[in-house]
Amino acid sequence: EPLYEKCRLQKKPVTVMFIDADHLKYINDTFGHDMGNLEIRGIADGIRKVFPPEAVSMRYGGDEFVVLLPGCEKAQAESLKAAFLKALDEISKSLHAEFDVEASIGYEVVLCGEKSLNECINNADEKMYQFKKARKAQRE
């Protein structure tokens, strides 16, 4: 939250990314919790690999992550989202597991701190669910 407040005071844009591990319950139930942990670690590795050093990332829930990106506007956020999803594909291939490391991602770009951090997280979460739903429909 201090980073978010700093961006608000400096009137800088900030992007809040919400990332959800896909199929974690299925992976845990089918392959065991060690494999579920492998998916979580794969997502964390993707975050470290793709997002810039000034980004602040945190595990938000059992299978969710939030990443704050100071000074990040929409075009850069879209580029980082694509790079993150590509990184997960590469991580999946390197693991040779019986499942793919996949995540759904949504983001909210806020200019001049016009919303609270909680509002941004909730909006990014909603956009993540829209992404998840659209990808599921595309695969069917």
Predicted features along the sequence, with ranges:
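PAS and PAS-like sensory/regulatory domains
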Residues: 99-104
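Residues immediately flanking
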Residues: 21, 71, 105
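A near-ubiquitous, low-amplitude feature marking generic local secondary-structure context
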Residues: 26, 67, 88-89, 107
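Preference for short coil/turn "hinge" residues that link or interrupt alpha-helices
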Residues: 50-53, 92-94
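Conserved long alpha-helical elements within nucleotide-processing catalytic cores of c-di-GMP signaling
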Residues: 1-16, 22-52, 58-62, 66-67, ...
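Catalytic-core segments of nucleotide cyclases and related cyclic-nucleotide turnover enzymes
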Residues: 29, 78-85, 89, 93-96, ...
